[in-house]
Amino acid sequence: MAKKPIDPKIAAELSRLALMPDDEIDTSDAPEVTDWNRAIRGRFSTVSLDERGYDVRAIANWILDYLSEMRINASNMSLNKLIYFIFERGLVERHILYTPARVEAWNHGPVFREVYHAVKDNDDKPISDRISRYSVRDREMVEAREQFSADDMDFFKSVIDDYKDFTAAELRRISHRDDGPWDRVWKSAAPVNPGMVISIELILASAPERRDLDGRY
C-alpha cells in the first residue's frame, strides 16, 4: 500500500520541532521512570489530590513578577526553591498538585528541570527576562502564562511572603533539612530512580504539615 504523503505544513512543523534544542523541549508531562531494584518503597498515599495542571514555567514567571513588584531579585537557585516550597506546601497543606512537572534532587536542592535550563545562562545573577515555551497553536515561542485562580494566587503569595527575605543559600539550606524529601532522595544508597525524582508520595510521607521558617519542625 502506498504511503500517503505528509502535508507540507505538517512536514515543515516536524522539521522545526526536530531542530529544537533540548533545553526548549517540554518534558513536564513525561511519565516518571522508577527502578525499584533494591529500593525501599515509600508509604502508599491514600490522599486524593486536586490537580491544577499549571505549567511550572508559568508559575516561575508569576513568582518573578510578584518579586519584581516588591523590587526583589531572584536567581536560578532561589527561584527553583520558591517554586518547590509552593509545590510542597500545596501538596501537604492543601492536597493540591499545582503542576505535573517533576521535581528532582540536585546538588543544590530541589530543581525543576524546565525552569533551570530556561534561566541557566543567568548563572547566579538576578533573572530579568521571563521564561518562554513553545506554543503549538501559535507555532512559536511565547511567554509562559496561565490563568491562575484568585485563591491559588493568594496561596502563592502567602508562601512567597514567608520566604522572600531569605537568600538563595538560606533557601537551599531549608530545602536540605535532615530527613526531608530532598535529603531522603539525595542520600539514598539504593538506585531509587535514575532522575533522582522527589516523588509526590515521598513529599507527603516526609514533609511536615507545618514548619518554622528556618526549616525546623
Where do the protein language model's features map onto the residues?
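Generic N-terminal leader/processing signal
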Residues: 1-2, 79
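A detector of short terminal or domain-flanking linear segments
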Residues: 2-50
